[in-house]
């Protein structure tokens, strides 16, 4: 369901010098132990211009750990480790792939669901379901230029049916992936509406070639990048993201992600809904030089063990499923799960599905975000073995705080101050 919210309580992104708040350490909640040196948001004026996008369920999505991990490697242009590449090849050869993020024949029921966001493009509006991705900066879609052999039931954008579409002369786009595949095409300017807010002249990248990994995702019609515009791939002139184009129409240049475990979440643009989180919001600075929402975590904690202080540079990425961290962190975590091991036949860490899985906490300054153990159990790969939601970032070169982590908190992406805000919330 898609709707526009215009009269929610808005909290200013301007912060005070002190903050206090509750600490949440239970495996059933996301914890933010809020210290006095962190920043709190005071109540502000009524929000004037903002909107909400509620995700929609994709009923055919079933989790596959190896394929989710492989997708992250491809996205960040990293070669797949040999073990993982072999697993992906075997799954593909066996015909077990129903989607790029996969399903495993031995476990056909749904374990979690990918959620997409409806976006209207053109006049009259053509509705496509897109993946909101803070790890990229292109709004690209399947289109009538995409060969039939590269489509698999996706809804396509047809610029010829939009009275507001115009071809951007000489402009092309291309995104390459770590497995050597790519997606590319031409560019149109058109009206794009998200959550009831319309912007004109938005760059819409129409695919004429699509990577097989996207072709197999039959319900995914494209991506809406929410990274910084400096990594947009349009040539010869980069184009702005939808968020950057819409900034001038928003009360505040920010959006929030309130993703959920096993149900649809939502994105709010232009305002912070005070009812969506508990306690206060802790902010940390963002390094946008590489176009990502990149921040430095202050460390980690496994279950009730002591917090380990360690600077870990990572990206808050709504377009990546798993939590990918350095090997030392990963091995420390799985050493606390009976029967856990690196399984070369799966290309990642697995453990008995019956095992007790501890929570995982990461630091944001002096605050703490706790991911429940139930979130860390990503999906079964057999009737008795499960694939972990935490995997190694080896070969990628940076840590990725994907949906496994983001679902455990209310997250603010402030494009004005270039900060990420983290707050506790009630978890499902």
Regions inferred by a protein language model and the residue ranges of each:
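A short acidic-Thr-Gly-centered motif at the start of a beta-strand
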Residues: 111-126, 292-311, 392-393
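Short hydrophobic beta-strand that contains or immediately precedes a catalytic carboxylate
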Residues: 114, 119-121, 128-132, 139-141, ...
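Disordered propeptide/prodomain
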Residues: 20-128, 284, 414
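Signature of the N-terminal lobe/flap region of pepsin-like aspartyl proteases
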Residues: 101, 109-208, 336, 361, ...
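Extracytoplasmic, non-cytosolic globular domains
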Residues: 273, 312-353
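Classical eukaryotic N-terminal signal peptides for Sec-dependent ER targeting/secretion
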Residues: 1-29
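Aspartic protease catalytic domain
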Residues: 41-62, 66-70, 74-77, 210, ...
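Aspartic protease core domain of the pepsin/retropepsin superfamily
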Residues: 194-290, 383-428
């Amino acid at each position: 369901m898609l709707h526009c919210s215009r009269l929610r309580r808005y909290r200013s992104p301007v912060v005070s010098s002190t903050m206090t708040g509750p600490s949440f350490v239970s495996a059933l909640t996301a914890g933010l132990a809020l210290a006095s040196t962190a920043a709190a948001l005071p109540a502000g004026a009524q929000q004037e211009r903002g909107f909400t996008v509620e995700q929609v369920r994709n009923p055919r999505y079933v989790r596959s750990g190896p394929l989710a991990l492989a997708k992250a490697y491809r996205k960040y242009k990293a070669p797949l480790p040999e073990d993982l590449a072999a697993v992906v090849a075997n799954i593909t050869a066996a015909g077990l792939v129903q989607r790029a993020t996969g399903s495993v024949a031995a476990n056909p029921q749904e374990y979690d669901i990918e959620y997409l966001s409806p976006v209207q493009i053109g006049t009259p509006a053509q509705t496509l379901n897109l993946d909101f991705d803070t790890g990229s900066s292109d709004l690209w879609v399947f289109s009538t230029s995409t060969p039939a052999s590269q489509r698999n039931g996706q809804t396509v954008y047809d610029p010829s049916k939009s009275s507001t579409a115009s071809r951007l002369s000489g402009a092309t786009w291309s995104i390459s992936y770590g497995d050597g595949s790519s997606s590319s095409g031409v560019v149109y300017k058109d009206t794009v509406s998200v959550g009831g807010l319309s912007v004109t002249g938005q760059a819409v990248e129409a695919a004429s070639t699509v990577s097989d990994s996207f072709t197999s995702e039959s319900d995914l019609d494209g991506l809406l990048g929410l990274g910084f515009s400096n990594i947009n791939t349009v040539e010869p002139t980069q184009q702005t993201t939808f968020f950057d184009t819409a900034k001038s129409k928003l009360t505040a240049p920010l959006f929030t992600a309130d993703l959920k475990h096993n149900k649809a979440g939502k994105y709010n643009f232009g305002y912070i809904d005070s009812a969506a989180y508990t306690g206060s919001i802790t902010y940390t600075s963002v390094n946008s030089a590489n176009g990502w929402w990149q921040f430095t975590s202050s460390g980690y904690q496994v279950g009730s063990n002591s917090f380990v202080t360690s600077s870990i540079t990572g990206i808050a990425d709504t377009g990546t499923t798993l939590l990918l961290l350095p090997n030392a962190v990963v091995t420390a975590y799985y050493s606390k799960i009976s029967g856990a091991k690196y399984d070369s036949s799966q290309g990642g860490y697995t453990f008995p599905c019956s095992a007790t899985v501890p929570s995982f906490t990461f630091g944001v300054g002096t605050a703490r975000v706790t991911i429940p153990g139930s979130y860390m159990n990503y999906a079964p790969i057999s009737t008795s073995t499960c694939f972990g939601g935490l995997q190694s970032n080896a070969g990628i070169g940076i840590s990725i705080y994907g949906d496994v982590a983001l679902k455990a908190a209310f997250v603010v992406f402030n494009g004005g101050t270039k900060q990420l805000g983290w707050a506790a919330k009630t978890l499902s």
